[in-house]
């Protein structure tokens, strides 16, 4: 059931902890919001012509999404104050000495930066969440917070701008989702024409949908409505949700700009902004869209940013849009794979990959409880591999950008529920899909960089579980051999001698002269060996399934 579609009459009587019928502290003002005011102290000189708070010019001079938006001059406006500091330090937390906190952070690999960073919590109760949130947590069976949650919750609940850096699968979504619910419940109720109070920007539709699912679970008790705004589907239902009014909007940048451009919603009420997987959004070229969107939001908002990595581009975005932020990093900033994942890298010829995959899949699926995610470099190869596996008796399904959204949703559901044990995907799924119970990841094609390799294999071995990742490495990938060996060594994995030799001969940047050494056959396309068979064929998910082997 989606709470965003409900019409509320205000007759909900679930009062608790001093909250009104919507779970919110009473507030009188409704449509009296001014659209301006700022934090003051704006500085010139930031990248791309933006000042300290991202007040820019360049991105408004081009056509495309958001071309009709007018950049707001916040310095000449007055903003009505809002509440954002809800953190009350628990007695147990307060009584811990600095030495104990330092030791605990060291044990959990938590590193913090900034002034007056709150101490980490160790339980849900210590985080200071209201009873209605704690009840949802207990009902859903959560036992203990993850390290990123332990430190991020007191940071976000205190109303500070913050950056959280942690590996995929570490619980980042709840790190901002639960504080967002508390934030909403302390704001005045929405009035007709109001936009959302919380805005979450995400790089992919799949990730946006998963965030929405978490928001729905934990917003249920206080009837917080949400909607998910992304491309590839009709705008009508999304427009309907926005017009009816939602407290939370989870969106991909392009579709949200489309909605803003056509006056289907506004961001005047946004006081809690989340940039999730910021590094991925920048990798996908969303920086201009992000800047246009954020410029429409009052600058005294609370902004939280989460990322799996901390490159210079993400650091610049944080400097431009976060005010006096504090930062938590869990684990090393160096690129590293989870030690819960067994990494098996095989050096093979391009022409042998398909046969190798068939052999490995047969071995893996001897256990019917296993769930396999296969990554390919292109949509064509994803479809080819899906057909190959189905013809071999394995009920594989493919997901990539050329599939219609309803088909993608169906494939995800089939995979998530275990009806299909194999999903073949392009990188649209590498960081946007969170499916529990993935036991094996296959890199049929090695990605363009080792960072994507780490994110791909991070689909397994999540939340303390064990996982296995198979990778077929060819001479085409030689320039990444040295970095891959480093990742394998750090995780104490066995290394194929052929890969070590490839790394020695590789320049690490241009591929070296290794291809002259004879491992590759040359002339084959990446993911090749198929020739021109099935060229132009579509509908891989409807390819005939041979006599089932599963």
From Swiss-Prot:
ATP binds at residues 166-173. Its main location: cytoplasm. Residues 1-25, 525-550 are annotated as: Disordered. Residues 510-533 are annotated as: RNA-binding RGG-box. Residues 153-328 form the Helicase ATP-binding domain. The keyword NAD does not apply. One of its GO terms (cellular component) is nucleus. GO terms for biological process: alternative mRNA splicing, via spliceosome; nuclear-transcribed mRNA catabolic process, nonsense-mediated decay; rRNA processing. Its EC number is 3.6.4.13. Keywords: ATP-binding, Cytoplasm, Helicase, Hydrolase, Nonsense-mediated mRNA decay, Nucleotide-binding, Nucleus, Ribosome biogenesis, RNA-binding, rRNA processing. A motif (DEAD box) lies at residues 276-279. SUPFAM superfamilies: P-loop containing nucleoside triphosphate hydrolases. It is an enzyme of class 3 (hydrolase). A motif (Q motif) lies at residues 122-150. GO terms for molecular function: ATP binding; ATP hydrolysis activity; mRNA binding; RNA helicase activity. PROSITE patterns: DEAD_ATP_HELICASE (PS00039), HELICASE_ATP_BIND_1 (PS51192), HELICASE_CTER (PS51194), Q_MOTIF (PS51195). It is found in: Cytoplasm; Nucleus. Residues 340-503 form the Helicase C-terminal domain. ATP-dependent RNA helicase involved nonsense-mediated mRNA decay and ribosome biogenesis through rRNA processing. Belongs to the DEAD box helicase family. DDX5/DBP2 subfamily. This is ATP-dependent RNA helicase dbp2.
């Amino acid at each position: 059931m989606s709470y965003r579609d409900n019409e509320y009459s205000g007759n909900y009587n679930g009062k608790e902890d001093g909250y009104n019928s919507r779970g919110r502290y009473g507030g009188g003002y409704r449509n009296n919001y001014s659209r301006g005011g700022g934090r003051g102290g704006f500085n010139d000189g930031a990248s791309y012509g933006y000042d300290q708070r991202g007040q820019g010019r360049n991105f408004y001079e081009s056509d495309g999404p958001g071309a009709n938006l007018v950049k707001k001059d916040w310095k000449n406006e007055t903003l009505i104050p809002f509440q954002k500091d809800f953190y009350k330090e628990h007695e147990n937390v307060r009584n811990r000495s600095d030495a104990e906190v330092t030791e605990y952070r060291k044990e959990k690999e938590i590193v913090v930066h900034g002034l007056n960073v709150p101490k980490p919590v160790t339980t849900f109760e210590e985080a200071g969440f209201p009873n209605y949130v704690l009840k949802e947590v207990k009902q859903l069976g959560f036992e203990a917070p993850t390290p990123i949650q332990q430190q991020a919750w007191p940071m976000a609940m205190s109303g500070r701008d913050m950056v959280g850096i942690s590996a995929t699968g570490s619980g980042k979504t709840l790190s901002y989702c639960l504080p967002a619910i508390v934030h909403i419940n302390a704001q005045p109720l929405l009035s007709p024409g109001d936009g959302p109070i919380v805005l979450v920007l995400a790089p992919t539709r799949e990730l946006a949908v998963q965030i929405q699912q978490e928001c729905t679970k934990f917003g249920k008790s206080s009837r917080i409505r949400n909607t998910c705004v992304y491309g590839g589907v009709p705008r009508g239902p999304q427009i309907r949700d926005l017009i009816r009014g939602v407290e939370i909007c989870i969106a991909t940048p392009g579709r949200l700009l489309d909605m803003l451009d056509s006056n289907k919603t506004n961001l005047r009420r946004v006081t809690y902004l989340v940039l999730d997987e910021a590094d991925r959004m920048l990798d996908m070229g969303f920086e201009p869209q992000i800047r246009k969107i954020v410029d429409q939001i009052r600058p005294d908002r609370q902004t939280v940013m989460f990322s799996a990595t901390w490159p210079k581009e993400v650091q610049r975005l944080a400097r431009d849009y976060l005010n006096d932020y504090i930062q938590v990093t869990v684990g090393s900033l160096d690129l590293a794979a989870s030690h819960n994942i067994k990494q098996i890298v095989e050096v093979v010829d391009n022409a042998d990959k398909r046969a190798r995959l068939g052999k490995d899949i047969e071995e893996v699926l001897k256990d019917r409880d296993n769930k396999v995610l296969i990554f390919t470099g292109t949509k064509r190869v994803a479809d080819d591999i899906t057909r190959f596996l189905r013809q071999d008796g394995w009920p594989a399904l493919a997901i990539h950008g050329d599939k219609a959204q309803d088909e993608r949703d169906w494939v995800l559901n089939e995979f998530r529920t275990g009806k299909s044990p194999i999903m073949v995907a392009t990188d649209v799924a590498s960081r946007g899909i969170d499916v529990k119970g993935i036991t094996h990841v296959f890199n049929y094609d090695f990605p363009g960089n080792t960072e994507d390799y780490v994110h791909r294999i991070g689909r397994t071995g999540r939340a303390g579980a064990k996982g296995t990742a198979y990778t077929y490495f060819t001479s085409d990938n030689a320039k990444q051999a040295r970095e891959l060996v480093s990742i394998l060594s750090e995780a104490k994995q066995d290394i194929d001698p052929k890969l070590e030799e490839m790394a020695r001969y590789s320049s690490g940047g241009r591929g070296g002269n290794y291809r002259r050494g004879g491992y590759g056959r040359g002339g084959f396309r990446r993911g090749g060996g198929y020739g021109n068979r099935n060229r132009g064929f579509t509908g891989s998910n409807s390819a005939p399934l041979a006599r089932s082997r599963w």
